[in-house]
Amino acid sequence: MERYGSITTPVSVPRLIVGAMLAAGVAVLILAFTQYGLLAGLAVSVIPAALCILWVTLRNPAISMLGLFVVNYFIMALTRYAHDLPFGMILDALIFYNFLIITLQALIRPIEWKRASSGLTVVAAIWMAYCILEIVNPESVSVAGWFSSVRSIAFYFFFIVVLTQLTMTEYKYLKYMLAVWSVLTLIAVGKACMQKFFGFNAAENYWLFVLGGRSTHIIHSGVRYFSFFSDAANFGGSMGLSMVVFSISALYYRNSWMKLYLLLVAAAACYGMLISGTRSALAV
């Protein structure tokens, strides 16, 4: 009988190096927990995950863009539960990280920069320039207020347009994005259904009855549900866009099961749009 291994087989040098690195990592982790406390131990334990993320995103920057897409989807929910965290800075850091990944990739292999020279990029650049010029508007209240507004409606728009064209370079990435988007849509609708059938949680009640959200979301015609979005208008607009995108996407899929899935997601998004009670979603 042929044997596939033996305990007497010499261990290769790379395996010895990996084993030594793992042993050293465990030792450092134990030292951090025992000598410097829980926070230090958690910080050290995150380093391997961060290195893995760096390696994966360097190999495929599209994954980093999908991660940015997911974080951007949920970050509005986090603002309701933790008011003091700088969530805008988190998005800034993630966008900078994506540009850094693209720059590092350019050192290894050529990047098709011309992909970013599209009509959409020109439109985004014109819009950003217009918003920048608004700083000299005499009606502007403050530079800080101007920057806070322009950062989200102009800078993010331009940077995301450029990054998407540089990273999503293959058709398969569009499928990946639709798959991620569909899951996020179902989660958003599920959260709205929880609000409708089980009620609001403590943070949502605080926003409604203390911060004044009640005046626009609990009205004479009923309750406008907002899921984990900032308000019902954003939730309804997002669900309206999801309904349109997934309805159209279902027409182009040949796989019957995928076609059915996308139609169900579109139907769920339509339901979410309806219970949001926002009229602006109809414009989508």
Each predicted region: which residue ranges?
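Transmembrane alpha-helical segments of multipass membrane enzymes and assembly factors
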Residues: V56, N60, L163-T169, A192, ...
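Membrane-interface helix caps and helix-loop-helix hairpins in membrane proteins
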Residues: Q35-Y36, Y81-L85, E139-F147, L274-I275
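Hydrophobic alpha-helical membrane segments of integral membrane proteins
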Residues: S64-L68, A144-F147, K175, R279-V284
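Hydrophobic core segments of transmembrane alpha-helices in multi-pass, intramembrane catalytic enzymes
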Residues: A43-A50, N72, I90-F99, S148-V161, ...
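Membrane-helix interfacial "entry" motifs
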Residues: V11, I111, R115, S140-S149, ...
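Alpha-helical transmembrane segments of multi-pass inner-membrane proteins
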Residues: E2-S6, P14-R15, A23-G25, A49-C52, ...
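Aromatic-anchored transmembrane helix interface
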Residues: I90-I95, G119-A129, V143-L166, A179-V180, ...
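Transmembrane signal-anchor hairpin modules in multi-pass inner-membrane enzymes, especially those
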Residues: M1-L133, K172-K175, A179, Y252-M258
